[in-house]
């Protein structure tokens, strides 16, 4: 038979090539050794524990927020209930005070202002003109003169300041 190369011969030749090749060409694989496996597994476990811890922490924060919102809602409801129950008592107290007290009750200012505004005359005439002195200060009202419009003095009519610098 001629030269037939069997599969076993090829495997043995490959093993010889690998054993004679330079070992520095093969990169270091930490997972190939025992302590490398331990290191990789430890790192993976630490990452998983960290993720679980962060999820648990966020869940606790969410629960606290929900609990505080419920407590706030309960206090608002209890305050509202107290106000409703005390409003009847306060109305009875006000009625009692009205019957026995001599002092008038407070009325809101808005009602007084509306009543006062209704009593005022409504005209579209402007106020009478006024008299001003040289300094622009109010002196008094001008006697009514038909068609005369008095204006305060302008700055142009004031005397110019004198410079005493020599």
Curated annotation (Swiss-Prot):
Location(s), subcellular: Vacuole membrane
Region: Disordered, residue numbers: 73-93, 123-166
Membrane disposition: Single-pass membrane protein
GO cellular component, one term: vacuolar membrane
UniProt entry tagged with the keyword Transit peptide: no
Highest taxon, organism lineage: Eukaryota
Transmembrane segment boundaries: 34-54
Keywords for the protein's UniProt record, in alphabetical order: Membrane, Transmembrane, Transmembrane helix, Vacuole
Protein name, entry field: Uncharacterized protein C630.04c
Species for this entry: Schizosaccharomyces pombe (strain 972 / ATCC 24843)
């Amino acid at each position: 038979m001629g030269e037939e190369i069997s599969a076993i011969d090829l495997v043995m030749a490959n093993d010889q090539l690998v054993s004679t090749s330079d070992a520095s060409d093969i990169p270091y694989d930490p997972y190939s050794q025992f302590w490398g496996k331990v290191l990789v597994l430890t790192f993976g476990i630490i990452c998983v524990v960290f993720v679980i811890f962060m999820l648990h922490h966020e869940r606790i924060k969410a629960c606290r927020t929900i609990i505080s919102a419920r407590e706030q809602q309960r206090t608002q409801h209890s305050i509202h209930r107290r106000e409703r129950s005390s409003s009847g008592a306060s109305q009875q107290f006000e009625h009692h005070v009205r019957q026995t007290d001599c002092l008038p009750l407070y009325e809101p200012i808005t009602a007084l202002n509306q009543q006062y505004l209704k009593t005022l005359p409504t005209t579209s005439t402007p106020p009478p003109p006024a008299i001003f002195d040289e300094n622009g200060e109010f002196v008094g009202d001008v006697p009514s003169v038909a068609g005369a419009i008095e204006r305060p003095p302008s700055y142009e009519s004031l005397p110019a300041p004198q410079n005493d610098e020599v």
